């Protein structure tokens, strides 16, 4: 009689192969996660920019007789911001040809419009942006995005 050897289970090669594949998947997720988080924070900053732009439009509608908004009057029209503290990081800049924007603030300049071309990414924080002249009811809302991590990108929205 012949004795059959019917052992059940996995060989060491099969176990090592499964662990190697799982390790590769884990490494890919681990590498991609920071970029995904940066992208989500940047999208949230863009949404905050739109929220502030809508607040400026609401202020303009409520104050048809003119005048200029201040930080305090603008904050009344902003419910909440995701990436910024509206009481300390929402700032109205003094009108001028350019302004600097740090990564922890959202800045508004009255009477200006965004430049026609997007400023090049840089490692500067704060970064400077030169704005175009606009009417008294125009405003430019500017934030500094993380972009790819090593370089920052200015994002500007006209009102």
Regions found by a protein language model. Give the residues of each.
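N-terminal leader/signal peptides at the extreme start of proteins
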Residues: 1-10
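N-terminal signal-anchor/signal peptide hydrophobic helix marking the start
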Residues: 10-20
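C-terminal juxtamembrane segment of a hydrophobic transmembrane alpha-helix
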Residues: 22-40
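Membrane-proximal amphipathic alpha-helices
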Residues: 38-49
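Short, surface-exposed interaction loops/tails
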Residues: 122-159
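Post-signal/leader-peptide non-cytosolic segments of secretory proteins
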Residues: 68, 91-103, 137-143
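Surface-exposed intrinsically disordered loops and tails
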Residues: 91-101, 109-132
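Alpha-helix exit/C-cap motif
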Residues: 54-86
């Amino acid at each position: 009689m012949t004795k059959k050897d019917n052992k059940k289970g996995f060989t060491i090669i099969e176990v090592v192969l499964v662990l190697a594949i799982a390790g590769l998947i884990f490494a890919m997720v681990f590498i991609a996660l920071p970029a995904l988080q940066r992208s989500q924070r940047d999208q949230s900053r863009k949404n905050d920019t739109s929220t502030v732009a809508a607040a400026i439009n609401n202020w303009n509608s409520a104050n048809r007789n003119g005048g200029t908004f201040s930080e305090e009057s603008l904050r009344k029209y902003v419910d909440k911001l995701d990436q910024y503290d509206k009481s300390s990081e929402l700032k109205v800049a003094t009108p001028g040809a350019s302004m600097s924007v740090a990564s922890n603030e959202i800045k508004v300049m009255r009477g200006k419009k965004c430049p026609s071309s997007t400023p090049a990414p840089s490692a500067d924080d704060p970064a400077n942006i030169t704005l175009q002249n606009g009417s008294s009811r125009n405003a430019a809302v500017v934030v500094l995005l993380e972009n790819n991590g090593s370089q920052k990108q200015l994002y500007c929205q006209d009102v």
